[in-house]
From Swiss-Prot:
Originating organism: Burkholderia lata (strain ATCC 17760 / DSM 23089 / LMG 22485 / NCIMB 9086 / R18194 / 383)
Similarity comment text for this entry: Belongs to the UPF0102 family.
HAMAP family linked to this entry: UPF0102
Pfam families documented for this protein: UPF0102
NCBIfam families, per the entry: PRK12497.1-3 (NF009150), YraN family protein (TIGR00252)
Descriptive protein name: UPF0102 protein Bcep18194_A3391
């Protein structure tokens, strides 16, 4: 179903400042939405087409669903951390989270994209920097 793609580093434009405080439950949804919007804009500037956001399927939620020009579906998990302490943003996508993402993605794929190849990317915001991890994990890794 999913296959590997070459990595492409992010350019870091349009990011929060390093001193921004985006912790706390009261701000988590609006702040998360802001990071998802920045991730979406970043990916669109690189040629991906927006399909859906915040899709809740049985078993999990998909932050962003994008499509490559060749038709490949891209399921994007967006993570933000103020620092690399405790592993950082990308490392926070552990095996439990990957399992939930894969379950949700498989349902979405079956309903809306069966036949298309797909992959799982992570857009990580950490200390004011953006990293785009293409093909961050595979369905059989979860």
């Amino acid at each position: 179903m999913c296959h590997a793609a070459p990595a492409r580093p992010g350019d870091g434009r349009g990011l929060p400042r390093a001193g921004d405080n985006f912790s706390g439950a009261a701000r988590s949804k609006p702040v998360g939405a802001a990071f998802e919007q920045r991730a979406r804009q970043f990916l669109e500037r690189r040629g991906l087409v927006f399909v859906a956001a915040n899709v809740t399927m049985r078993g999990g939620e998909l932050d962003l669903v994008m499509r490559e020009p060749d038709g490949m579906l891209v399921f994007v998990e967006v993570r933000a951390r103020r620092s690399a302490r405790h592993g950082g943003a990308a490392a926070s996508v552990g095996w439990r989270k990957r399992r939930r993402l894969v379950a949700a993605a498989l349902q979405f794929w079956a309903r809306h994209g069966a036949g298309a190849a797909c992959r799982f990317d992570v857009v990580a915001f950490e200390a004011g920097q953006l990293a785009w991890l293409r093909d961050a994990f595979r369905a059989d890794d979860a």
